[in-house]
Curated annotation (Swiss-Prot):
GO terms for molecular function: translation elongation factor activity. CDD domains: UBA_EF-Ts. Residues 82-85 are annotated as: Involved in Mg(2+) ion dislocation from EF-Tu. It comes from the Bacteria. It comes from Nostoc sp. (strain PCC 7120 / SAG 25.82 / UTEX 2576). NCBIfam families: tsf. It is found in: Cytoplasm. Keywords: Cytoplasm, Elongation factor, Protein biosynthesis. One of its GO terms (cellular component) is cytoplasm. This is Elongation factor Ts. Belongs to the EF-Ts family. Associates with the EF-Tu.GDP complex and induces the exchange of GDP to GTP. It remains bound to the aminoacyl-tRNA.EF-Tu.GTP complex up to the GTP hydrolysis stage on the ribosome. SUPFAM superfamilies: Elongation factor Ts (EF-Ts), dimerisation domain, UBA-like. InterPro entries: EF-Ts_dimer_sf, Transl_elong_EFTs/EF1B, Transl_elong_EFTs/EF1B_dimer, Transl_elong_Ts_CS, UBA-like_sf.
Amino acid sequence: MAEISAKLVQELRQKTGAGMMDCKKALKETEGDVEQAIDWLRKKGIASAGKKSDRIAAEGLVDTYIQPGGKVGVLIEVNCQTDFVARNDAFKTLVKNLAQQAATADSVESLLAQPYIEDANLTVDEAIKQTIANLGENIQVRRFINFALTDKTGVVDSYIHTGGRVGVLVELNSQSEAGAANEEVQNLARNAAMQVAACPNVEYVSVDQIPAEVVQREKDVESGKEDIANKPENIREKIVQGRIEKRLKELTLVDQPYIRDQSISVEDLVKQVKAKAGEEVEVSRFVRYILGEGIEKQESNFAEEVAAQMGVK
């Protein structure tokens, strides 16, 4: 078996919050497979399913753009190297412009090739390089996604939390344009985005959207937990089923207590809005970006990075 590197142990620690020795043992037991090691730690009760890394190294901003009319929306993440630059007005303006331009782009590469919105003589890539030269830091468009209601009726809305560190884009579908324009429906879209931002473990709208392989993985983890190993099989099955149902609800938006009224669920809220709008309304999809999620900050010379992106040797 290959030797378990310190980097691999650190990655597992960041993903699970487990101790160094537990992570090393888990990786040895799973031959260095991080995802299997996470499940091994969960079966041992050492790691929880909902642990998120709190060691995010990248700076920058997550921002959104909603086209007038609410039919097109963008969620974008642009990274820089320090919080100082992230709070700079020139950087903020750049990010807002990039969010707007990403509405008509299908990839980062195509976005970079567009004429820049503030100066058509420049491409977006050239505008970014000018900002790099002015601010002295590397700047990169990490990712973006756009939602467009081309063949459906409804509304797209967004929410930005903690000054651009968390962003959510939501699409809500209705039966008619009148329904989409309903104030209650539009408020639901914004409140759903806010709910997703407040619930970091939520990954799906409803249980029926959860892939079969995710359900099976949860079943395998729960079935392998040591605290039920000695119980009769029929009791084990009931415990496992109850735990799976609870876990799957933790992953779904509609099963969460509504943040503005904990006495009802998001599903209850949607039903209330349906009744007021007089037609079917549903949250169809969402995306959440957390600034720097999954990025490891490299130890490097910042001046050399800037020069490399500027094409200077």
